[in-house]
Curated annotation (Swiss-Prot):
Biological classification of the source: Viruses, Duplodnaviria, Heunggongvirae, Uroviricota, Caudoviricetes
Pfam families: Anti-RecBCD_p2
Superkingdom of origin organism: Viruses
Protein's UniProt name: Anti-RecBCD protein 2
Role according to the record: Modulates the activity of the host recBCD nuclease. And thus protects linear double-stranded DNA from exonuclease degradation.
InterPro entries: Phage_P22_anti-RecBCD_p2
Species name: Salmonella phage P22 (Bacteriophage P22)
Length: 97
């Protein structure tokens, strides 16, 4: 006889409801959702704009937290020593890395 699946006795996964109870609960929630008034296009766009503004604000806060505002310590690339610019590698080939 095979062993039961992992988590089969987990109370969070065992609903303990019969099929009719599950269907009654679904029917009640479905009726509740269908009884809500239909949202107009303007209301939906307004809600979306608010959600988008909140999302952008959260993103700005996150970016500030991981990259605080700093002033650059230098604005130009550091000059490379001319002696290191042309490095002669094996067999006399010039290597610039």
């Amino acid at each position: 006889m095979p062993a039961p699946l992992y988590g089969a006795d987990d109370p969070r996964r065992c609903s303990g409801n019969s099929v009719s109870e599950v269907l009654d609960k679904f029917r009640k929630n479905y009726d509740l959702i269908m009884s809500l008034p239909q949202e107009t296009k303007e209301e939906k766009e307004f809600r979306h704009c608010i959600w988008l503004a909140e999302k952008e604000e959260r993103e700005r806060i996150y970016q500030t937290a991981i990259r605080p505002f700093r002033k650059a310590t230098y604005t130009k690339f550091i000059e490379i020593d001319p002696r290191l610019r042309d490095y002669r590698s094996r067999y006399g080939a010039i290597s610039n890395n």
